[in-house]
Amino acid sequence: MSRYEKMFARLNEKNQGAFVPFVTVCDPNAEQSYKIMETLVESGADALELGIPFSDPLADGPTIQGANIRALDSGATPDICFEQIGKIRAKYPDLPIGLLMYANLVYSRGIESFYERCAKAGIDSVLIADVPTNESAEFVAAAEKFGIHPIFIAPPTASDETLKQVSELGGGYTYLLSRAGVTGAETKANMPVDHMLEKLNQFNAPPALLGFGISEPAQVKQAIEAGAAGAISGSAVVKIIEAHVEQPQIMLDKLGEFVSAMKAATQK
């Protein structure tokens, strides 16, 4: 069983959904970023979704762009990020760890050597935000070669054909978009996802985690009530980092409070 399968099985037994926070690795710097990831897990995160800093994150709103800039300004490189992820993997051997990133970063390293590096760091899944299913063949092949789950986005506008491809090609979990547009906590998630969840189930997709605009416990509860296996929250987490860059300990305390509250909302 993969780490994701084990996580979903464990949560099912407890009658809970998954809460998965997203952060950019090395935001605001490598050392604090490690403490942030540790705090997220210790406060109840079921898995981590991580970004590798990139100068042009297309699908992201200003909050996550800011995280990328802070990380790059601190001297972050993909290698430093992989090192930090490797340390988290060593500390939490059962934690599912996913990357959410852009194709340029994969290309710049060479597709195969990128996935090989992921496997070495103990990463479970990779979602490439700007690669749709119909352009994904070489990424999926490399992912499978190195035992990494390829993750795909199921957008609210998706045709049945796209949802079928997402279901067949994806592994680990399915990233279900609550709305179109860029990421951000300002624009709340819409929740008419029942139809999509029905279709994904019909096509036997990996469990769906709802993302984009998830910033409060009530939305986590709603996502799970609608039939999602859990929720992903990125911009709301990164906003806490942004607000307390000068107060590292307060930042960790606030992140801990946020994650605990979001995780509590996953109880069915």
UniProtKB/Swiss-Prot annotation:
What cellular-component terms does GO give this entry?
A: cytosol
State the reactions this protein catalyses: (1S,2R)-1-C-(indol-3-yl)glycerol 3-phosphate + L-serine = D-glyceraldehyde 3-phosphate + L-tryptophan + H2O
* Catalytic site: 49 (proton acceptor), 60 (proton acceptor)
- MF terms in GO: tryptophan synthase activity
Pfam families given in the database record:
Trp_syntA (PF00290)
Alphabetically ordered keywords of this record: Amino-acid biosynthesis, Aromatic amino acid biosynthesis, Lyase, Tryptophan biosynthesis
Identify which top EC class this enzyme belongs to: lyase
Keyword Lyase appears in the UniProt entry: yes
Cross-referenced InterPro entries: Aldolase_TIM (IPR013785), RibuloseP-bd_barrel (IPR011060), Trp_synthase_alpha_AS (IPR018204), Trp_synthase_suA (IPR002028)
* Record flagged with keyword Lyase: yes
Look up the EC number in the record and give it: 4.2.1.20
Tell me the protein family, please.
Answer: Belongs to the TrpA family.
Protein name per its UniProtKB record: Tryptophan synthase alpha chain
